């Protein structure tokens, strides 16, 4: 849902928006690893070399946010920024607390507690893109 809401015209030319959630490989990967499809999608991002330098945005998947932080620790991957605003009662607050506590130095945007969601994540990404566009900092 985040990928759908991003205003592509505000992004630098040739910017890719990658969402693996509909990737047919995900169910098998998730089952083999004993994780959620969204967490498995993070592994696909890493395998495809897409984490380093990327802006990672999540609005609904605390397990994916946890996995991004794990992959960063395990591999040294370094996104440019993380917009981590998962919503919900199970793991959402904890995943955002883990993001805040992360000592990698990667910039982040979050909303502490259980509130969040795709709309907030999209708004944050679009605001960053708009700001970069108006300051020529793309």
Regions found by a protein language model. Give the residues of each.
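Structural motif
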Residues: 15-18, 53-57, 79-83, 106-110, ...
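Buried hydrophobic positions in well-ordered alpha/beta secondary-structure cores of metabolic enzymes
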Residues: 83-84, 124
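C-terminal functional extensions of proteins
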Residues: 90-138
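Feature captures the catalytic cores and cofactor-binding loops of soluble hydro-lyases/lyases
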Residues: 64-81, 93-94, 99-101
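Long, charge-dense
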Residues: 3-54
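Solvent-exposed alpha-helices and their adjacent loops that cap or buttress functional pockets
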Residues: 9-11, 46-51, 73-77, 100-103, ...
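Glycine-rich phosphate-binding loops that contact phosphosugars or nucleotide phosphates
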Residues: 38, 58-74, 90, 124
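Short glycine/serine/threonine-rich phosphate/pyrophosphate-binding segments
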Residues: 2-5, 63-68, 89-93, 117-121
């Amino acid at each position: 849902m985040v990928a759908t809401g991003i205003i592509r015209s505000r992004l630098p030319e040739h910017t890719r928006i990658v969402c693996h959630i509909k990737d047919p490989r995900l169910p098998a990967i998730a089952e083999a690893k004993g994780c959620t499809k969204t967490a498995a999608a993070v592994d696909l991002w890493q395998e495809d070399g897409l984490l380093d330098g990327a802006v990672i945005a999540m609005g609904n998947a605390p397990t994916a946010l946890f996995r991004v932080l794990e992959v960063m620790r395990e591999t040294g991957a370094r996104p440019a920024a993380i917009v981590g605003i998962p919503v919900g009662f199970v793991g959402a607050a904890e995943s955002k607390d883990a993001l805040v506590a992360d000592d990698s130095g990667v910039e982040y945007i979050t909303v502490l507690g259980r509130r969040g969601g795709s709309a907030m994540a999209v708004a944050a990404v679009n605001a960053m893109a708009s700001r970069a566009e108006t300051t020529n900092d793309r």
